[in-house]
């Protein structure tokens, strides 16, 4: 999805100044235990689907929506892996816009869909094994998330997603099997 309208409106007021935004990120696994990654179109780097949480949108809904938009895969969120921020979650775009993200990272299971890039933000989308991931150029924020969540044993509460792809009447796992 292109730049959200509320970000464009803020940019018109603040220019390229640093903007702090909430982001949802999804570590989604298929039945074979492979991780869904997307290749960022501008940079060529690989990482999990993620994106800005729109005003009044639940983080869980943003996570499910972004995974659908960027990779064509519908997921069921299982738990929160962590909340991340810092230098590896900041970016300066080619036009000078500065962004610092606070990312809520969710674990998820794939319910439906075959990975496909959106063609705007992502140029590739695949399920990958750890060995395949190790051979790819990955984003700094993904490296931080991957290292920090490799041994997570506790689960945090979150309100489950209610967002559903347009045209589907119901989105529970039982509706897809």
Segments from the language model and where they lie:
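Acidic, metal-coordinating catalytic segment for phosphate/diphosphate chemistry
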Residues: 1-25
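Short, well-ordered beta-strand micro-motif
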Residues: 28, 105-109, 126
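A short coil-to-beta-strand element that immediately follows conserved catalytic motifs
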Residues: 74-84
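Nudix hydrolase/Nudix homology domain
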Residues: 45, 115-177
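Active-site-adjacent beta-strand/loop module that shapes the phosphate/pyrophosphate-binding cleft
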Residues: 85-114
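Conserved Nudix-box catalytic region and its N-terminal flanking loop in Nudix hydrolases
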Residues: 30-70, 163
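A generic structural micro-feature
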Residues: 18-20, 95-102, 119-122
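Short connector loops at helix/strand junctions that flank enzyme active sites
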Residues: 21, 30, 41-43, 48, ...
């Amino acid at each position: 999805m292109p730049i959200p309208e509320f970000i464009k409106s803020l940019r018109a007021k603040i220019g390229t100044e640093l903007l702090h935004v909430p982001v949802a990120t999804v570590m989604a696994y298929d039945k074979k235990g492979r991780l869904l990654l997307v290749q960022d179109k501008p940079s060529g780097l690989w990482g999990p689907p993620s994106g800005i949480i729109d005003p009044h949108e639940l983080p869980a809904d943003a996570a499910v929506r972004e995974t659908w938009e960027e990779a064509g895969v519908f997921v069921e969120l299982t738990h929160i892996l962590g909340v991340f921020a810092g230098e590896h979650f900041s970016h300066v775009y080619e036009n000078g816009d500065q962004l610092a993200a606070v990312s809520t990272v969710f674990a998820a299971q794939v319910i439906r869909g075959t990975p496909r890039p959106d063609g705007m933000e992502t140029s590739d989308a695949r399920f990958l094994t750890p060995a395949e991931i190790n051979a790819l150029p990955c984003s700094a924020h993904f490296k931080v998330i991957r290292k920090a969540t490799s041994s997570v044993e506790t689960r945090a509460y979150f309100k489950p997603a209610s967002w559903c792809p347009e045209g589907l009447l119901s989105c529970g796992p039982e509706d897809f099997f």
